[in-house]
């Protein structure tokens, strides 16, 4: 079963990115054909700063590799290194009704938040469809806010298949409900937009500051505390197995510890969990040529599959 996902190189990764998406990708490597790319074309909808995009792409590659993406088990590449995706994007646009794109929630939301209403942003779902359909993807792991884009890709695939025969595999969105939403320091969904993140590769000083900012209620130190509605507990349980969660729950119910104690505990959890990943991340950033070699290795494999797919499409469209 082929699984594909792409993540934009939009700066520092946070634990919401990891538990909401990256961990599932790493786990999927053992039982599925995992295709993963750094979506630098998509990132251009929010920034056209070339040097920043280049550096963020290298940082993203280092981050994903340090967190467990294995280029020997997964096909891992930079989106712009497989040009066929832009060719398919143009072809698919001929099968995409304007009304389908006008109904896209993501476009409306981003424009409402002040992002420029460019053609690139408007047609973002068509490029995402090209990413998915080019590789005959069966499963697309996404957050709830991206389900509609996978549905659009499926609609486009059906329209093309009705015209040309069964040329595209119909994709399905997969949402991990258990970690569909990772709460941020303010209790809302963790997001860079909300400035409520706990960043994976930040300094220990920054990490401590972010965890210290977690919003809690005013329950006194000596009193029992409600773990179910506590943002610290909601984040901490991501790092704990069932017995660890139970032990922490008992500490909450017993009383005698303040939220400051639990923040110190969470800080220790996060530091220990990502210690090796941080070390590897810093090592990789010092070797940009090695990162490029890894991305080139993945792009070669992805390009071969893409070219074979495009050859079939050329025959259908007369190119």
From Swiss-Prot:
Segments carrying motif 'KMSKS' region: 189-193
Locus of motif 'HIGH' region: 9-17
Cross-referenced InterPro entries: aa-tRNA-synth_I_CS (IPR001412), aa-tRNA-synth_Ic (IPR002305), Rossmann-like_a/b/a_fold (IPR014729), Trp-tRNA-ligase (IPR002306), Trp-tRNA-ligase_bac-type (IPR024109), Trp-tRNA_synthetase (IPR050203)
Entry's EC annotation: 6.1.1.2
Record localization: Cytoplasm
Binding annotation for ATP: 8-10, 16-17, 143-145, 182, 189-193
UniProt cross-references to Gene3D superfamilies, sorted A to Z: HUPs, Tyrosyl-Transfer RNA Synthetase
GO biological process, one term: tryptophanyl-tRNA aminoacylation
Entry GO MF terms: ATP binding; tryptophan-tRNA ligase activity
Positions with a binding annotation for L-tryptophan: 131
Location, primary (coarse class): cytoplasm
EC class: ligase
Keywords: Aminoacyl-tRNA synthetase, ATP-binding, Cytoplasm, Ligase, Nucleotide-binding, Protein biosynthesis
GO CC term, one of those recorded: cytosol
SUPFAM superfamilies according to UniProt: Nucleotidylyl transferase
Pfam families: tRNA-synt_1b
Catalytic activity: tRNA(Trp) + L-tryptophan + ATP = L-tryptophyl-tRNA(Trp) + AMP + diphosphate + H(+)
Subunit (UniProt): Homodimer.
PANTHER family associated with the record: TRYPTOPHAN--TRNA LIGASE, MITOCHONDRIAL (PTHR43766:SF1)
UniProt record similarity statement: Belongs to the class-I aminoacyl-tRNA synthetase family.
Function: Catalyzes the attachment of tryptophan to tRNA(Trp).
Entry protein name: Tryptophan--tRNA ligase
Organism: Campylobacter jejuni subsp. jejuni serotype O:2 (strain ATCC 700819 / NCTC 11168)
Gene designation per UniProt: trpS
């Amino acid at each position: 079963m082929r699984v594909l996902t792409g993540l934009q190189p939009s700066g520092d990764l946070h634990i919401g990115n990891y538990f909401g998406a990256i961990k599932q990708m790493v786990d999927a490597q053992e039982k599925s054909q995992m295709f993963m790319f750094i979506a630098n074309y998509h990132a251009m909808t929010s920034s056209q700063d070339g040097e920043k995009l280049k550096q963020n792409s290298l940082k993203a590659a280092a981050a994903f590799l340090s967190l467990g993406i294995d280029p020997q088990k997964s096909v891992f590449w930079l989106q712009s290194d497989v040009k066929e995706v832009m060719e398919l994007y143009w072809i698919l646009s001929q099968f995409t009704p304007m009304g389908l794109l006008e109904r896209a929630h993501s476009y409306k939301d981003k424009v409402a938040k002040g992002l420029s209403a460019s053609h690139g942003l408007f047609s973002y779902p068509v490029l995402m469809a090209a990413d998915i359909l080019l590789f005959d993807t069966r499963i697309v792991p996404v957050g709830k806010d991206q389900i509609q884009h996978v549905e659009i890709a499926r609609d486009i695939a059906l329209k093309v298949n009705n015209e040309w025969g069964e040329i595209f595999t119909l994709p399905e969105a997969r949402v991990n409900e258990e970690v569909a939403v990772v709460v941020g320091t303010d209790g809302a969904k963790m997001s860079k937009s909300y400035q409520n993140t706990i960043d994976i590769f930040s300094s220990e000083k920054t990490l401590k500051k972010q965890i210290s900012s977690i919003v809690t209620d005013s329950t006194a130190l000596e009193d029992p505390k409600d773990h179910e509605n506590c943002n610290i507990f909601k984040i901490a349980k991501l790092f704990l197995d069932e017995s660890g969660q139970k032990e922490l729950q008992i500490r909450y119910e017993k009383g005698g510890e303040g939220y400051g104690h639990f923040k110190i505990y969470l800080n220790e959890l996060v530091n220990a969990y990502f210690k090796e990943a941080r070390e590897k991340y810093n090592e990789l950033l010092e070797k940009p040529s090695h990162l490029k070699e890894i991305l080139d290795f993945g792009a070669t494999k992805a390009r071969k599959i893409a070219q074979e797919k495009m050859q079939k499409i050329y025959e259908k469209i007369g190119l």
